[in-house]
Amino acid sequence: REKIEAAVHELGYMPNLAASALASASSHTIAMVVPNLAEAGCSEMFAGLQQILQPAGYQIMLAESQHRVEQEEKLLETLLASNIAAAILLSVEHSTTVRQWLKNASIPVMEMGAIRSDPIDMNIGIDNVAAMYELTEMLIQRGYQNIGLLCANQEQWIFQQHLHGWYKAMLRHHMSPNRVINAALPPNFSTGASQLPEFLLAWPELDALVCVSDELACGALYECQRRRIKVPDDLAVVGFGDSDVSRVCQPPLTTMAVPHRKIGSEAGRALLERLNQGNWSDRKSIASSLCMRESC
């Protein structure tokens, strides 16, 4: 029995609980597992998926792993044994066990949100390297010389992608890429406010700050107001995401827009193509776009 269990684990075998009853039936349920329903862009991507999949007769079963590896494994173990037509995940880190299960599953698997170098199967999202490069390049072209980068509590692979784009732009213009803080804190308003003084203490020459989320950037803007630092005259601040808050903070925030709804709808179309015809390319990059406002 131990040998059988070891072989089952090694092969990533998952018994189909509905196989006897549904062997001849085709499922129209697609499972979507997300770390947190409040994750940036999650609701917009879900809406994009629904827009395409629902008219085609597919229903999306949404589950939340709460950023817990064991919870994601438990959810997917149940879902993969329940005759689902496809699985959708956000572009986040997954355990070796989950990756093995999904690679061995005879269903389409879509990771969406950001382009990965090692997708499980299908992958649609923005290119974080290109997006960060474009955001940094824009500041350089506008004459800023002493630019900093604020990151906070990102998945390591996303941090590396942002850092790659940042280094690429800065080194292309022979500028120092070393003004970087990667805070082990949530990417929220209070972190942005608390980290700005750290930048000014370490690099008083700072004239522009790139933040990897709009919430971080708006927190930095609030701290600038408290310290009577004029934005953008004394310090330019830019964000990432084009969230609602970027439009209402003062001054309105220049940011990199991520087309979450389009990512969702493109993922839906790709899944339909795979489900109906059995073919689709592994990856597709969706362009992000600069939203120029008054903070730089």
Task: Say what each PLM segment does.
Residues 4:
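Short conserved active-site loop signatures built around small residues
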Residues 10, 47-59, 74, 80, ...:
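Bacterial carbohydrate/catabolite-sensing allosteric modules
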Residues 11-78, 82-86, 164-168:
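Amphipathic helical "hinge" segments at domain boundaries
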Residues 32, 89, 211:
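Redox-cofactor binding/interface segments in oxidoreductases and associated redox assembly factors
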Residues 34, 91, 113:
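Flexible glycine-/small-residue-rich
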Residues 66-69, 90-96, 215:
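Short beta->alpha connector loops
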